[in-house]
UniProtKB/Swiss-Prot annotation:
Phosphothreonine: residues carrying this PTM: T1359
Protein's name in the database: PH-interacting protein
Extent of the WD repeats: 181-222, 224-262, 265-310, 319-360, 363-402, 422-461, 464-504, 512-551
CDD domains, alphabetized: Bromo_WDR9_I_like (cd05529), Bromo_WDR9_II (cd05496), WD40 (cd00200)
Compositional bias ranges of the Basic residues kind: 912-924, 1297-1310, 1435-1446
Tissue expression as described in the entry: Widely expressed with most abundant expression detected in pancreatic islets, brain and skeletal muscle. Predominantly expressed in developing and regenerating neurons. Expressed in adult brain (granular layer of the olfactorium bulb, hippocampus, dentate gyrus and cerebellum internal granular layer). Expressed in the CA3 region of adult hippocampus, adult and fetal retina, perinatal dorsal root ganglion and embryonal olfactory epithelia (at protein level).
Region (Mediates interaction with IRS1): 924-1129
GO molecular function: lysine-acetylated histone binding
Annotated stretches, region: Disordered: 653-695, 782-927, 1282-1310, 1435-1507, 1556-1596, 1623-1676, 1740-1785
Keywords: Acetylation, Bromodomain, Isopeptide bond, Nucleus, Phosphoprotein, Repeat, Ubl conjugation, WD repeat
Compositional bias (Basic and acidic residues): 800-810
Major place of residence: nucleus
Length: 1821
């Protein structure tokens, strides 16, 4: 052995070999050869050891052959594996980095000891490095103590924030208080600049001011008439501005709450508000963006707080429907960036003295809905729905961006789960940390991603939310901390440096589930943060004690919060009852949500009532005529000043004059009384959502309150001196202003310098688009010393900014300048202001919603012609009050919103649903109101392509039933042209050729048409594929939208026209003529070639032609006509010849046979024209005779896309416009459709339209009818009779959507005694559904979605579900467990979220609240149900044990006799060998009390042991069949026990539903192949343990002659047997004794020699081949029909001794409502059972089982232990070990063995083969 070999380990020699293999396989071949030679010489390779132990050297080639299982790169693979393996044990500091050369925690040699935490001593903490404390190492342990940190700071005067304030400190932030202060969702919250005040803005139109330190409600700012969409506090902390969906901006003084201005510059909702940080003397700016696509800059003075009402306005609407969504100012206020729905970012600059637009950045591919400037520089980040964010910075005269792709994943991490399920990533929110080092983006996959703001590198992915996140709030001074909140109710504090969660809070609301968090803000000092939620709560978090917050009430409202207001001409408001400005009214009383005043200790918390006497703190209560309590301001014992008494007397006299006797009677009904100081008026616990019939007391109690709240002069003086929000101290304000000024100057300097620098490269992106400065700027700004502090600036998307409004006329829908929607115009202070507050519902709607409550903001297309709306009996909703202004806006109305006609990505125009008042008696609007909004009436008029009454070949006008050829090339050209000209937003990826394989031309049939309102009006078609040979539909289809556009050739060609042209012979040089604009044009064919090479066979534009005027063009053969001999040519070459009427008629469509019924088209057209003439003479049709007068109703064309009327239809009939009956009927239906769209449902004009439409359709269908008057009379009589019936039913209680005055107590479903009734869940679920129906939030989900209103609903939603269907299914008894009901209810919410993507619309918050409410209550129902199951299971087991103990001696003796076992086993063996499964002959039922007979002999009652109990039962009447043929009964061969009593009843209950449906006398065959079976099969595949099948017996009292029933349900748990008619191989009477095998049995196959049937004896389901064989056999033996009038009755007769519950179950009516596909389950039937005599069950199962239905989850747990394994039995005697895996044959053999030590008997009487160990134990005993 060589010297080198000595001491060489085996590992080293293997390493040499692997290195040589690695080098040999790589580029270093020569080095490999050298190494191989050297290791061979020195014998360094692994050696071989022979059988004697001697070692022998081996060559390299020998080793390669020996280790041929090793790849050449085996060494490299080992290195790859080392890193991940070590990572699991000792994580490295930088995850994902794979290196062999790392050090420290990156080293592959690292150990736990080498990576332990480092702890510095005090001297190290006090050291300085480069003038600052050194940074802690990565493996630094716990942060140093606060004492060491403070001492080091004392030594060196410096500190690091992470040491002084570690992020663990934020774990001590807790929720101080959750206050209910609003009646609706609160989308806006902000702090003032001091952090001592909190402002909340809600959907209930109120802005409230709260004290941060103790949570007191300080003031309510009233005035808005719609939802608050955004708020902003100025930097001087002197005023607050709030924008609303009512298109107004209201500004209040923070010191006195006095209104400073009402700004009206937008024609649609306000989407964002920002106070500019810019400082120029006393001049300041306020910016606002709106859904009308405009941005306004309002100039105001910081000294006087005066705001110029005329803004500098930019209209950024390149096409209708574009909205400005978000905005953000730079730190110095010199830049403003905005995002909008047209994908463009616009940047405005203030450095030239006035705002000017300097850039338009169009690099996002979807809407930009979040934007935020950095805190210290001129960088900003934008987030888009295209799944990307961009960080922008102005460099070298252009805006450059860093792309942040949300699909990026961190290195070394493979995030699975939800991220993979999200098909399209979307950015929902963006934010910067305080130091601008990182950018945080919220993604729709419920994660937050942290990026390096300078490189765009992904740093962390923060996971913890369970729903989408729309709130990101950085800490005001700590760059490590970020707050996030989402719709899942979680508020999470993150450590951005480590990427971990510091603390999380869950907003659980008792009785209502969780509340989705909609906004969150942190106070400027970082001590508090506040959140608001979907239920109207304000949540205050902070450090320290909550003792101050414990002194306030949980519900805080002022009694005057919801009083009606009146508006003057400038939209300033006064309280209607006191005629005072709200801020001048005396201090209000504090009440709860139901209007009950709080005790006096709480009243002192109201500003102005701190020093009041006790009696002055108790409000005087009165009762209104409606029975509601109300607060009266003056107390009976209070001294009233002379001024007060005089004003009060004058007001009372005025009231009497106005109301007359009514006022006296109303006043007399008010019982005034004083509440004692010791008593407290409490509301019922506010658990659960508010009911729709139960208006909150705080809102309704003052609707008719007397005007008694008048302030005295001393009150006004004292009140005017109050300070609600303190101003900033002079030093702080001046310092912040200096900072903002400096930042502004820095931004100007940076911008100017970058503007002068030249481009380094001409990039494709980020080009500066300089716009012409053609805007009229009214205000100029002197840029002096200006500076800003970036504090409290937000970029969150408000609810209005997030709402989807894709098609135009948002400003008209919101409605200030148009009043066409409301039946009653809301007149406010002399101005015509319409505030539509209704949304699609079958019943009453919310009291306070606007256009943002449209719960289906995204739209689709109607794929079918309009059909009749189902007739519903509706009740008129009760109005809560008779107010003149606000109440009109809050009236409950039945309104159907017109679908907004675009998909989520589409930003085209909307078509809001307008209401037309009854009989068209509506206030006329001047056309000028349209022009005020930048629109003209002509823009909205439908094109001539739609309104033309003459048939033309070009352009093609689609009609129902048209068979057309679709040309993909033409459609692609249309899409490209529409995109190029930006006519409307169109997504090329959603075109049909991206969804399916399309040839160049396809034969299609038009099966659906709908027109969409917009600019332009679009035609939406559904095209179905047509087989050209058979003319039948093939089943496929697609949808498309298009309109007639100049310079775009028709790509839909009638089949008739195509076929005529296809066979027309054209040659080069042939002359032709073509119809263009109703004239003949002549030309010559020059050549033929395909338009595109990839479609060589396409005829689309395949000819190159030359017109006579010299122009060349491509033409399609169907556009060219042969020139006849008698053709008229133009006088001048190159001109045209007009078409004659004869030529026009010859070119139109020639109808096919049957398209006009049995008569020719001309005859039918004349008949229908005559009928229409008669119809037009009737008064009921007068409104539909002529087109709608657009001068009188200018908004009509903005609502109705396809206007039509009787005269238009008549004219088209005369011109032979319609190509078939279905085309005509489609247009007739549109009369009703348009009327219903424009008018209020249920109004007389809608009823008239329905009647006229039905009448005309009946007339058209009846081709023998030539006089419409008799038909009119008969239909009129029928309608009158129907209306009388409806009037009779008018007093019937309405649906739950109706307003109810009675206040039923709200119950908690969980506060009830524990019930162990398994069926109790049905009643509990019924109560829960009743509560849900009474909740206001359930209105959109109560009834099925109207497919006429939302035709694309089924395209998106596969399985519709609603609460009415759930209730019907529950009442019909079709839910077998509460889990199934829970699944359907959850389906309702998942369907809604899938169909309505707008996450911050009001309807979305309703769904969140209702879903959380349901989950909160259903949890207790599920818990009780599972508890009942467990109780019954334990009860059943205890019964078994008692029975077993009572019969132990009898069972032991019976089991010990082998001869007895043989006798028992014989019928069992016979019964198991059978032919046709479930072939059950039945006979007529004899009286149930006759003597039971088996084989003609009376039998006594028998004792039967079942798994639940053992009962003695009465005899059953049976009769031996008279026929000689064998009647066969079959027992399932599954691993079950047959229970002829109870199991039969269970199965009969289950089959009663199926039997009730068998009404036909024809033979029926039951098939195995059902959807239930397949679903069950899938379920069983997923379970690790097969379920044990239950075998039961289905019995009849006695057989019927000459009838048989074949009942096959092979896939269910129970199989069917009739014990009363058991006959085995032709011999009757002896019932079978069934053996139930234990778990783990091997399958045993028995062959029936008589029938050849193979029965697989194994657990679980039968094999498919056996099922098929049994199915065929069953069908062959099915010779007699099943009589529905026999089976159920016989079943009931057999169950004569059962209790009423079982009879109810058996006689249950058939399923009602929607029938969900569910797995059959066994019902719990625990009572006496009727069985034949001598039926005994030999039990083999040693497991504790129950017949009760077990919850699937519990059953899964129970089945986990069902695998074969060793079991023991210890009854205080001996212990025997036995196996359960012996076969069935072995089991039978044990019955006949006589050796005492080869088998034993278990506690249940089962024979068990003893193991050797068991024998040894027995011998040892």
């Amino acid at each position: 052995m060589s010297r080198e070999r000595k001491g060489l380990s085996e590992l080293r020699s293997e390493l040499y070999f692997l290195i040589a293999r690695f080098l040999e396989d790589g580029p270093c071949q020569q080095a490999a050869q050298v190494l191989i030679r050297e290791v061979a010489e020195k014998e360094l390779l692994p050696r071989r050891t022979d059988w004697t132990g001697k070692e022998h050297p081996r060559t390299y080639q020998n080793l390669v052959k020996y280790y041929r299982h090793l790849a050449p790169d085996h060494l490299l693979q080992i290195c790859h594996r080392l890193g991940p393996l070590l990572e699991q044990e000792i994580p490295q500091s930088v995850p994902g980095v794979q290196t062999l050369l790392g050090a420290g925690r990156q080293s592959l040699l690292r150990t736990n000891k080498s990576c332990k935490h480092v702890v510095w001593k005090g001297s190290a903490l006090a050291a300085l490095h480069c003038g600052r404390p050194p940074e802690s190492p990565v493996n630094y342990g716990s942060p140093p103590s606060i004492a060491d940190t403070l001492f080091s700071r004392k030594l060196n005067g410096k500190y690091r924030l992470e040491r002084l304030v570690p992020t663990a400190v934020y774990q001590h932030m807790k929720m101080h208080k959750r206050i209910l202060g609003h009646l609706s969702s609160v989308y806006c919250v902000t702090f003032d600049r001091t952090g001592r005040r909190i402002f909340t803005g809600s959907d209930d139109c109120l802005v409230k001011i709260w004290a941060t330190d103790d949570g007191r409600l300080l003031a309510t700012l009233r005035g808005h008439a719609a939802e608050i969409s955004d708020m902003a506090v100025n930097y001087e902390n002197t005023m607050i501005a709030a924008g609303s969906c009512d298109k107004m901006i209201r500004v209040w003084c923070l010191r006195t709450c006095a209104p400073l201005a009402v700004l009206q510059g937008h024609s649609a909702s306000i989407t964002s508000l920002q106070f500019s940080p810019l400082c120029s003397g006393s001049k300041r700016y306020l910016s606002s963006t709106g859904a009308d696509g405009t941005i306004c800059f309002w100039l105001w003075d910081a000294g006087t707080l005066k705001i110029n009402p005329r803004p500098t306005k930019f209209t950024e609407r390149p096409r209708p429907g574009v909205q400005m969504i978000c905005s953000s100012f730079s730190a110095g206020g010199m830049f403003l960036a905005t995002g909008s729905t047209d994908h463009i970012i616009r940047v405005y600059f203030f450095g030239s003295g006035q705002p000017e637009k300097i850039s338009e950045l169009e690099f996002h591919t979807d809407k930009v809905d979040s934007i935020q400037f950095s805190n210290t520089s001129n960088r900003f980040v934008s987030g888009s729905r295209d799944g990307t964010a961009r960080i922008w910075q102005f460099k070298r005269r252009e805006w450059k961006s860093i792309l942040l792709d949300m699909a990026t994943r961190p290195a070394g991490q493979n995030l699975q789960g939800i991220e993979d399920k999200i098909t399209k990533m979307k950015v929902t929110m963006v934010a910067w940390d305080r130091h601008d080092n990182t950018v945080i983006t919220a993604v729709n996959n419920m994660t937050l991603k942290v990026w390096n703001s300078y490189t765009g590198q992904l740093i962390h992915v923060l996971m913890g939310h369970e729903d989408e996140v729309f709130v990101l709030e950085p800490h005001p001074f700590d760059p490590r901390v970020l707050f996030s909140a989402g719709h899942d109710g979680n508020v999470i504090v993150w450590d951005l440096a480590r990427g971990v969660k510091v603390r999380s809070y869950f907003n659980m609301i008792e009785g209502q589930g969780h509340g989705a968090v909609f906004d969150c803000k942190c106070s400027p000092d970082g001590q508090h943060f506040a959140c608001t939620d979907s239920h109207g709560h304000l949540l205050i978090f902070g450090f320290g004690s909550s003792s101050k917050y414990d002194k306030i009430a949980d519900q805080m409202f002022f009694h005057s919060d919801y009083r009606p207001l009146i508006r003057d001409a400038n939209n300033f408001v006064l309280d209607e009852q006191t005629q005072q400005a709200p801020h001048l009214m005396p201090p209000p009383f504090l009440v709860d949500v139901d209007g009950n005043p709080h005790p006096s200790r709480y009243q002192r918390l109201v500003p102005g009532r701190e020093n009041c006497r006790e009696e002055q703190l108790i409000p005087q209560m009165g009762v209104t005529s409606s029975g509601l309590n109300q607060v009266l301001s003056q107390q009976a014992n209070q001294d009233i000043s002379p001024l007060d008494s005089m004003i009060q007397r004058l007001q009372q006299e005025q009231d009497l004059r106005r109301s007359g006797e009514a006022g006296v009677s109303n006043a007399s009904r008010v019982n005034r009384g004083s509440v004692s100081s010791t008593s407290e008026v409490h509301s019922p616990p506010n658990i659960g959502l508010r009911r729709s019939g139960q208006i909150e007391g705080v809102r309704q109690m003052h609707s008719n309150a007397p005007r008694s709240e008048i302030a005295t002069e001393r009150d006004l003086v004292a009140w005017s001196r109050r300070v609600v929000v303190p101003e900033l101290s002079a030093g702080v304000a001046s310092r912040q202003e200096e900072w903002r000024t400096a930042k502004g100057e820095e931004e100007i300097k940076s911008y100017r310098s970058e503007e002068k620098r030249k481009h380094l490269t001409v990039a494709k992106e980020n080009k500066i688009l300089t716009v012409s400065k053609n805007h009229a700027h009214e205000h100029f700004l002197d840029l002096g010393d200006s500076k800003k502090q970036q504090a409290n600036q937000h970029n969150y998307r408000t609810r209005s900014a997030l709402e989807e409004t894709p098609r135009p006329l948002e400003e008209l829908e919101n409605g200030t300048s148009s009043s066409d929607e409301g039946e009653v115009l809301a007149v406010s202070g002399g101005t015509s202001e319409e505030e539509e507050r209704a949304w699609h519902s079958d019943g009453s709607s919310s009291d306070y919603s606007s256009d943002y409550s449209d719960w289906t903001a995204d739209a689709g297309i109607n794929l079918q012609p309009p059909k009749k709306v189902p007739k519903h009996k509706t009740k008129k909703p009760e109005s809560s009050s008779d107010e003149e202004e606000e109440s009109e806006n809050q009236k409950q109305k039945h309104i159907k919103k017109e679908r907004k006609k675009a998909n989520e990505e589409k930003d085209g125009p909307t078509s809001p649903k307008k209401k037309k008042p009854k009989e068209r008696k509506q206030k006329r609007l001047a056309v000028g109101e349209l022009t005020e909004n930048g629109l003209t009436l002509e823009e909205w008029l439908p094109s001539a392509w739609i309104t033309d009454t003459l048939p033309r070949r070009c352009p093609f006008v689609p009609q129902m039933g048209d068979e057309v050829y679709y040309f993909r090339q033409g459609h692609e050209a249309y899409v490209e042209m529409a995109r190029k000209n930006k006519i409307y937003s169109i997504n090329p990826k959603k075109q049909p050729w991206h969804k399916m394989e399309l040839r160049e031309q396809e034969l299609m049939k038009i099966v659906g048409i709908k027109y969409e309102v917009g600019l332009p009006t679009l035609c939406c078609l559904k095209l179905a594929f047509l087989d050209p040979d058979t003319g039948k539909l093939t089943g496929g289809s697609f949808t498309m939208k298009y309109h007639d556009m100049p310079d775009v050739i028709d790509f839909l060609v009638l089949r008739q026209q195509f076929d005529d042209a296809k066979y027309r012979p054209w040659n080069i040089g042939d002359r032709f003529r073509s119809v263009i604009d109703d004239a003949w044009w002549f030309g010559t064919i020059e050549s033929q070639e395909p338009l595109q090479p990839e479609y060589p066979d396409s005829l689309f534009q395949c000819y190159n032609v030359c017109w006579d005027n010299g122009d060349t063009e491509k033409m399609s053969p169907w556009d060219m006509e042969l020139i006849p001999n008698n053709a008229v040519f133009p006088e001048e070459l190159g001109t045209s010849v007009p078409l004659t009427d004869v030529e026009c008629r010859s070119l139109i469509y020639k109808p096919l046979d049957g398209e006009w019924g049995a008569n020719p088209r001309d005859e039918e057209c004349e008949r229908i024209v005559g009928g229409i003439n008669q119809l037009m003479t009737l008064d009921i049709a007068s409104a539909f005779v002529a087109p709608v007068d657009l001068q009188a109703y200018p908004m009509y064309c903005t609502v109705v896309a396809y206007p039509t009327d009787l005269s238009t239809i008549k004219q088209r009939l005369e011109n032979r416009f319609y190509r078939r009956f279905s085309s005509l009927m489609w247009e007739v239906r549109y009369i009703e459709h348009n009327t219903r769209t424009f008018n209020e449902p249920g109004s007389p004009i809608v009823k008239s339209a329905k009647f006229v439409t039905d009448l005309l359709l009946h007339f058209i269908k009846d081709q023998t009818c030539y006089n419409i008057i008799p038909l009119y009379n008969s239909m009129k009589k029928k309608v009158l009779s129907d209306s009388e019936e409806e009037e009779k039913d008018a007093d019937v209680p309405g649906t739950s959507t109706r307003k109810r005055k009675d206040h039923q107590p709200r119950r908690r479903l969980r506060n009830r005694a524990q019930s162990y009734d398994i069926q109790a869940w049905k009643k509990q679920c019924q109560e829960l559904l009743n509560l849900i129906f009474q909740c206001e939030d359930s209105e959109p989900f109560r009834q099925p979605v109207d497919l006429l209103e939302y035709p694309d609903y089924r395209d998106i939603i596969d399985t519709p579900m609603d609460f009415a269907t759930v209730r019907e299914t529950l009442e019909a008894g079709n839910y077998e467990s509460p889990m199934e009901l829970c699944k359907d209810v959850r389906l309702i919410f998942s369907n809604f979220k899938a169909y309505t993507p707008s996450k911050r619309s009001r309807i979305y918050s309703m769904s969140l609240r209702l879903s959380a409410f349901f989950e909160e209550h259903i949890s207790s129902v599920l818990s009780d149900y599972k508890s009942a199951l467990r109780f019954h299971k334990r009860n059943t087991i205890s019964k078994k044990r008692k029975k077993r103990n009572r019969s132990s001696s009898l069972s032991s003796s019976a089991a010990s006799s082998p001869e007895r076992k043989k006798r028992i086993l014989k019928p069992q063996l016979k019964s198991e060998v059978s032919t046709s499964p479930f072939s059950i002959p039945t006979r007529s039922v004899l009286p149930r009390h006759n003597a039971a007979q088996m084989n003609g002999k009376p039998e006594s009652s028998s004792v039967v042991r079942t798994r639940s109990n053992r009962v003695a039962v009465d005899p059953v009447v049976t009769e031996q069949p008279s026929t000689s043929s064998a009647t066969k009964a079959f027992v399932s061969k599954t691993n079950t026990s047959a229970m002829p009593g109870k199991a039969m009843l269970e199965n009969s209950v289950r089959h009663s539903k199926a039997l009730s449906t068998l009404s036909s006398p024809d033979p029926l065959t039951f098939s195995h192949a059902t959807k239930n079976n397949s679903a069950k099969e899938n379920m069983e595949k997923e379970k690790p343990v097969k379920r044990k099948m239950k075998s039961s017996v289905f019995s009849k009292a006695s057989p019927l002659p000459k009838s048989a029933a074949v009942i096959e349900q092979g896939e269910c748990k129970n199989n069917v047997l009739i014990p009363g008619t058991i006959q085995v191989n032709g011999h009757g009477g002896q019932p079978s004794k069934l053996v139930k095998r234990g778990p783990g049995r091997k399958p045993k196959v028995e062959v029936n020699t008589s029938s050849g049937e193979v029965t697989h004896k194994k657990r679980g389901r039968k094999p498919k081949n056996l099922q098929c064989a049994k199915q065929e056999n069953s069908e062959q033996n099915n010779m007699h029909p099943i009589r529905a009038d026999v089976l159920p009755s016989s079943t009931c007769n057999f169950l004569s001794e059962t209790n009423a519950v079982k009879e109810d179950l058996l006689q249950k009516k058939s399923r009602g409502g929607r029938k969900p596909k569910r797995k059959m389950k066994t019902h719990n039937l625990d009572s006496e059972l009727i069985v034949p005599t001598n039926v005994k069950v030999l039990r083999r199962s040693n497991r504790k089982k129950t017949d009760d239905p077990i919850d699937e989850e519990e059953e899964f747990e129970e089945l986990k232990g069902s695998e074969p394994h060793m079991r023991t039995r210890n009854q205080g005697r001996r212990t025997a070990f036995y196996n359960e895996d012996d076969s069935e044959e072995e089991q039978r053999q044990l019955l006949f063995e006589d050796t005492s030590l080869t088998f034993g008997t278990s506690s249940r009487g089962r024979v068990r083969k003893l193991t050797e160990k068991a024998k040894a134990n027995l011998i040892g005993w």
